[in-house]
């Protein structure tokens, strides 16, 4: 039984490593939108890097400014890496997120490279 589990684990690991390298994107997709959700925010976030060993980063927040009386719930957050050749950056949620009314996403490049992401946030008003 342990041998079967080990073989299954190795197979899954090999498939993950193989297809991860073929795809080469660093997409972030959190949550799932429902039938009554609307597009709340959309933005292209890109930054180039002129330092050969340095990295660049940027934070994107929604809502952009604090709007009092705005009652929303975020249901899906997508940050799609537009550089599909494994040379793009990485996206992390650092504050808020799904089931919150706000989110902050931190983007960071790989060393010596920039990044290019398309960010979309879906949710609904209540």
Identify the residue ranges that each predicted region occupies.
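Eukaryotic short linear interaction motifs
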Residues: 86-87, 113-115
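Extracellular receptor-binding modules and their adjoining Ser/Thr/Gly/Asp/Asn-rich linkers
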Residues: 21-56
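Cleavable N-terminal signal peptides of Sec/SRP-targeted secreted and luminal proteins
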Residues: 3-20
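Extracellular attachment/recognition segments
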Residues: 58-108
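Structural signal for hydrophobic/aromatic residues that build the beta-strand cores
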Residues: 10, 77, 105, 119-121
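Short, structured beta-strand segments at or near domain termini in extracellular proteins/domains
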Residues: 114-125
């Amino acid at each position: 039984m342990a041998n079967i589990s080990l073989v299954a684990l190795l197979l899954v690991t090999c498939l993950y490593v193989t297809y991860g390298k073929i795809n080469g994107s660093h997409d972030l997709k959190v949550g799932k939108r429902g039938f009554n959700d609307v597009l709340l925010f959309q933005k292209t976030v890109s930054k180039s890097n002129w330092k050969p060993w340095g990295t660049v980063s940027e934070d994107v927040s929604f809502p952009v400014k604090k709007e009092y009386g705005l009652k929303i719930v975020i249901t899906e957050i997508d940050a799609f890496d537009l550089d599909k050749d494994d040379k793009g950056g990485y996206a992390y949620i650092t504050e808020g997120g799904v089931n919150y009314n706000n989110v902050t996403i931190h983007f960071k490049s790989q060393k010596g490279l920039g990044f290019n992401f398309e960010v979309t946030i879906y949710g609904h008003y209540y």
